[in-house]
């Protein structure tokens, strides 16, 4: 998702000190469930290397991080909050009343099979000043292209 969203300029705009800023590259911040406490950590990981390298780094960082929150999120991240326990048709998050919060939030739920196809609920929440439906459509196309090329049997 990060790779595809980074290819679409509108997903990289943010408000910073009252001004509009376009970041060259956006990294990731995701929730990670600490199974022992059933509390979530917010983990920040630079999006670098291959997908396999990124996943290995992200898993290691999530497991090693002791703090649940390491401070306010920076502007140069995409937020991810997966919910693999439920299949949903709609999800909505509060925005804490911050009108200048332009950090996109991506969610996905529990995948399921229907008509011999694997389906995954996926939600995108964005700031409408920068991202419109056409941009979300471009993201969906890029994600689908990437998924169509992915060899699941090698993983």
Can you name each region flagged by the protein language model?
Residues 1-5, 138-143:
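Structural preference for long, well-ordered alpha-helical segments in enzyme cores
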Residues 125-138:
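Mixed-charge, glycine-accented linear interaction segment located at domain edges/termini
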Residues 1-28:
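Hydrophobic "lid/gating" helix adjacent to the active-site nucleophile
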